[in-house]
């Protein structure tokens, strides 16, 4: 089991699928991190502008705004926020775009929880 540090890291999670949002929140909560979860990209960005999260985990396929668009807006309003992209489809072109735009990691939904937590921890460790 991956153990995440107990240091305070502000994590924002954005996914339009409430079941994924809930499961991912629980997973991060289970290792001691608090997550602010959002289903709406605009609300996510409003809060990010004032709270400047350390880490954002963003779904790519959403109805109102793609995760890539959210990532672009987030870079402008909170340039220090590290981004992890999460998606249901593994599209190499989208993966390249996300990584070229500064994503620290890219995961496919359904990834084994230990692998996901290790990626989140590595990203969080790179903040300091």
Question: What are the roles of these predicted feature ranges?
Answer:
Residues 1-12, 18-19, 114-128:
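Non-catalytic signal-transmission and effector/linker regions of two-component phosphorelay proteins
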């Amino acid at each position: 089991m991956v153990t995440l540090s107990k240091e305070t890291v502000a994590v924002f999670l954005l996914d339009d699928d409430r079941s994924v949002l809930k499961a991912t929140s629980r997973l991060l909560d289970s290792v001691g991190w608090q997550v602010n979860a959002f289903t709406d990209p605009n609300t996510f960005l409003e809060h990010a502008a004032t709270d400047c999260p350390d880490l954002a985990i963003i779904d790519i396929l959403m109805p109102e705004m793609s995760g890539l668009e959210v990532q672009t807006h987030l870079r402008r309003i909170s340039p220090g926020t590290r981004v992890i992209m999460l998606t249901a489809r593994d599209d190499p072109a989208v993966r390249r775009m996300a990584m070229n735009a500064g994503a620290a990691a890219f995961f496919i939904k359904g990834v084994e929880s230990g692998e996901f937590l290790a990626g989140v921890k590595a990203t969080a460790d790179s903040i300091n």
